Each structure stands twice: as structure tokens, then as C-alpha cells.
């Protein structure tokens, strides 16, 4: 930058006076320099006179003659050399501020330290300490000064300090090297820096930037005015940017030099501050960032082919971006415009703020209306929370009841305390409306009087609600008591029957507990071992009574053919009982042993009621039964129904006599009176062919045994049980009053378990649901285990599926979990002796 660029000719004498501006002519010498001489061109008139650095001065320092330019300004001297810049206090401070921003201020500090050391007295003791401090601070610690010095220079300084040969010029070589580096790099960058250009724009005389720390508080302000809130009023006092007397031209070089500061500037106490590294104020979210080219808006009109006659200025063509001396074609103007854009580039400006407005649906509402709507919503939320909390508390209570019941059952099983089924103690009114109970009551009455017709509808109708009917049931309940009218100690003690209330009846809480237990714990079919274990626990809770004491069973029957297994005395016999099969309805060990001494009139068999299962289990059994009936039955299953009559024909006379005595009792003649059908309750309906009672009971036992076992296991198990019953009858043929069920349980259990295990080892039951179908598929495979690959081969439909198999698990309260298996070599898990799986399609 030369001094000629800063000296301008003032066309108007009334313009503002500058120190470096030319002075008016001295009176009397106005004609010395005519404004226009003949023969001089137009360009020479407007050419400013160069101001040399060697202005005419008096040798005696008395000042300059009048009519000549003033001496060089500080800004002009700064551009001459680095010495001139550092020789001025403001220049040195401004240059130091620039180096601090560039993080190389140590070079300037080292240069001033060398100047100060050169002026120190060598005889002073502080000189050695200062030399060592300069060496350690700037040269020894591998700083930026040490990197710019030559190795020989650093070695010379180090040797001089070690030998304590201190000289005033020992740092001159290092200072010269640092000065040359600053002149080549930092000084040239400083002359084009934004901090220097702003100081030039302010004229160097503005005291606003010299206060509060001098030039360090210099701020460059450009762009839009600060964002103003709608409720505030803008005042000029908050705006610190003041117009400067001189303006630097907006050339591409100047714009590039000041782009970084203008893009990172901030306005104090303003709402809109723009900084690329800082997050945007939430008030202006969504407005984006604005990048405007450093050209006029008219250039954009030209670039958009909007050059028309009405868009051209008739007075001054410079407004339209067209030089006054050159009016070319449209393509030439576009090319010049594109070159101007490339030269200037894009100047980043702060993003233009947008007013943050409320959504349309947020309209003002009356306070009363708003309060009513808010209260209604809060009440609805409160009800939802309360219902959720009550449901959680209820589930927690049910869970605690289950845990408490499980602990009680475990304690009872350990102590061997006798328990009685709670459903047998319910009064008649609790199950009066249950159709299953009505059929069971009717069947028990029919079997009580096997030689008579079915009772009439008018007298013994279980649907009747008359007081006589209630009294009849109540008397039936009291008939469970022994002749003394009291329960025996084994049944009357609270420890024996903990579910009884204070008066011998089941309370409401107990009934709820019983229902919850048998619905949630016995919905899944039990295995044979579980049924036998529960039977051995309940068999202790019996009441050994006389001839008038009996208990009847409410057995869970099939949905189409209810079966019962009563153990009542027929024909007035006191010592005879019916030979029973061990099945799901008639559990082993329920028959009572004979009285001590083996008297003929000793034992009355006690039949305990089995629990009421879930209705869904009945539907499941009905589906299995329907599937069984639709398939052709094997020969073994067909021959089972006729097994007992054939065996009766082949049995010995003593065996037939024993069987006849068991059924005939003391009546002296076999049963000849036909019994009506179970469902024949209408007198007008013709009676069916009366079946043999013994064969019917055998069929009931067979069906009960089939319910708890797979289809192909029923035949073998039923035949084994029939063989055991007949063998027991043959062994006790000499004593016709003995009970076949009196055979030791230790001899029957190993045989039965061995048969079951042998059957399970030979055949494997596989049941699976396919792709969400409601009816499952069931297959029997002759294998001990099954892998996923073999299971896939059994599927008729091939495709991509997911395979889940049920297995026992303690992770959840249900005790089971479906596990996904994807490897063909994995052995499928078993649940309750069978494989239960689900096949789901991969979407």
C-alpha cells in the first residue's frame, strides 16, 4: 500500500479537513500552480501528485514550508518496513494482537527481549540471569523461536552461556533471523489482516477502540442489525458500530481478508449472534443460513435473463452493473458477471431470522372452558391410573395366594397331614345350576338303586327349586355323616381338613381360594405319577363308618358320555365293593382296606371326588376323541370293549360265583331288573336296551384310563389293568367278601410303571400347531427321541418356518416356555412325556 493511495484530491473546499490532506494555497501564491495548463491532457489534471517520503523540510528542523503536504501518517509508515511498525507503540500493540491470534507471539517477544538485552550493562549481575532466562524461555524448550533459528546460532548462544562469556551482541544473529522470518510471513499477513484493515477504516483516531485494554478490544461489526424482540424498542446506544471517516473499498482482496471476522462477529447484548461453531439460537431455528454473493442485486437480475428496457436505468448505468464506457451484448455482460462472482466468491452472512409463531390449533380459549377440558382429561387419566394400580394389586394378591398355597401343599406333603377335597364339602346350593353336577347327582341316585327304574321327573328332578329339593340335597349332605351324627376325628379335626370353616362348611373365602387353585393349577392334564401322588395324600382324609355311611363321587365326565365310578354298596351288602380300574377318575389307593380282623361286614369303600378341570380341557379332550373316532380303530382297541364278556365266559365257575356274589349280594338272585338309560328322564320316551351294568362300568373305567394316556397306550394299559383285576379276583376266590383293590399297592405300582415306561420307550407322541391353525396335528413315532431334521421330514408342507417347542422352565409362573430351535441336529425337548411344538411361517 503506497502513500499515493491514501492521498485524495478534494474537489470541494468545504469538505472535511484531514491532517494528511493538501492545504489551501498561501495568499499571494494562488497563480503559482494553475489548475489547468495549456497542452496538458485530461488525464494529467486528475492525476494526484505523489508524495515522496523525503518531503521538503528545513535542515534546522523548523518545520515544513507552508503549502506543502504534512509528514507521513503512522498508517503510512507501518507499510514501509517492520522496523517502522515496531517503532510505533500502537503499531507494535496491533501487531502483537495479530500474532496472538495466529499463536506465534513468542517471535515478537523474543525480538523485544533481544533489544532490551543489548541495552543492558554487562557488569551488572542481572545480565547473566537475563541471558539464561532468554535462552531457556525461547531457545532451549523447542518453541517456535527455536524452530526458526539455525543450529549454528543456537550452538553459539548455548556455548556462550555455559562459559559465561556474556556479550551484548550475542543475540544479534538470532534476532536478525527471527526478524527476517517475520518480515517474510507475519508482517505481510498483518498488512492484509482484518484487524489492520479495520484500524485503517477507523482512521486510527477512534478512541472507542483504544479504551478497555487498547486495541485488544477492537470489534468488527457488519451485516444486519441485531434481532429485536417485538416488545422492545431499539436504541442506538446499544449499537457500537460507528461510521468511520474513511472507507476502504470493497475489492475482492479486501472482502477475502475480512470474511473470517465478518462471519464470526457478534453483537453484544443482541438476540441474534452468528458463529459457525456455535449452535443457532432456538428463536431462529428453521430459518437456515444465508450466503449472498458480493455483487449487487442487479447482477442477479441480469443472470436470470431479466435484462429488459424497463429494468435499465436511464440516468446512471453503473446502477445496472454496466460500465459507462462499455455497453456490449448480453452474452458479454453475463460473462463479466460470472467472472465477478468467481472473483468475489460468496460472503457468508448471518442467517436471516424468522419470527417464531404459534401453531394454528393453539387458539385463545376462555379460562373456564380450558379449565373444564383440563379437569376432564385429568380425571380420565386419574381413573386409568387407579384401574391400573388396582389391577396390579389384584395380580400381586393372586400371586401371593399362589405362593402361600404352594408352601402349604409342600408342608402338608412333608407332614403327611390328611386333606379332604374341598368340593365335596360344598352345599347343594353352590352347584345347583351346574349341568355337570345335575348329571352326577342323577347317576349317583341311579347306581344307588340299580334294580329300580330311573326316578320320576316330578319327584327327583334336579332342576327343581322347591324347598323339598333343597332339603333332599341337604339330607344327602348329612347322610355323609356316620350314624352318630358327627364326623370322626380324622375328618373333624381342623388340622386334617384345613379348608373347613368353623361349622364344617366351606366359607366364601375358601370357595374362592378353591376355585382359583383348581382353575389356575389344574388346567393342564396331569401325568399318571402326579395323579397317584395326590391320591395317596387325599386317601388319609377318610371317615371309617358303618353300614349307613357312604360318600359319592362327582367325577369329571366326557362332554357326550358322562362316566362315574361310585363305590357304594349294592344289594345291601356291607363287605363287597366294585372292582375298580385305575384311571384318571378313579385313582389308585382310594379303596379302603377292610376292618381290622377281616370281618365280612367290615369295609365301606370311600370314593373321593376328583377335581373339576377347566372347560377348555374338556373341549381339548372332545377334539381328541373326535379325531380318534374318525380314524379306523385298530384291532386291539375294538377287541377291548368285548374283552370283559369274553373273559366272563372263559372264567372259572368259582370266579363267576365270586363275581355274582359281588354284584348280587345277599339278595339271593342275580340282577334281572333292567335299568333305564342314563339320559332317559322323559317317561314318554321308550326305554333303550338295558346294558349290562358291569360292562358299562368297565367301559367307563376304560374311557377314564384313555383320557390320561395317548391313544395307542390305552389298549395295553387297559388290558394290563384288566389282567391285574382278574388275577386279584382269582387269588381271592376263596374269600368272596374280599376286595380286589386290597392287593398291596407295592405289587401293582411296579408293574404299571414298567408297562408305561416300556410303551414310552417304543413310541413317541408328537403334537404341533401349524401356522396358527386352531386344531393341532398329532403323530406317533417309534423312536425314543426326535431331532429337528427328522421333525421337518414329517411335515407335509415345505417352506421357511420357525420351530418352537414347549419345555419345562422355572423362569415364569406358568412353569413352561416355548423355545425356538433352528439347528437340525438338536434333539427336541419333551414336555410331560410328549413333544409339543408350534410351526410358524417366516414373513
Curated annotation (Swiss-Prot):
Residues 56-69 have a biased composition (Basic and acidic residues). Residues 477-494, 588-597 have a biased composition (Low complexity). GO terms for molecular function: beta-catenin binding; enzyme binding; I-SMAD binding; molecular adaptor activity; protein kinase binding; ubiquitin protein ligase binding. Keywords: ADP-ribosylation, Cytoplasm, Developmental protein, Phosphoprotein, Ubl conjugation, Wnt signaling pathway. A motif (Tankyrase-binding motif) lies at residues 21-30. InterPro entries: Axin-like, Axin_b-cat-bd, Axin_TNKS-bd, DIX, DIX_dom_sf, RGS, RGS_sf, RGS_subdom1/3. PANTHER family: AXIN, AXIN-2. Inhibitor of the Wnt signaling pathway. Down-regulates beta-catenin. Probably facilitate the phosphorylation of beta-catenin and APC by GSK3B. This is Axin-2. It comes from Homo sapiens. The lineage of its organism: Eukaryota, Metazoa, Chordata, Craniata, Vertebrata.
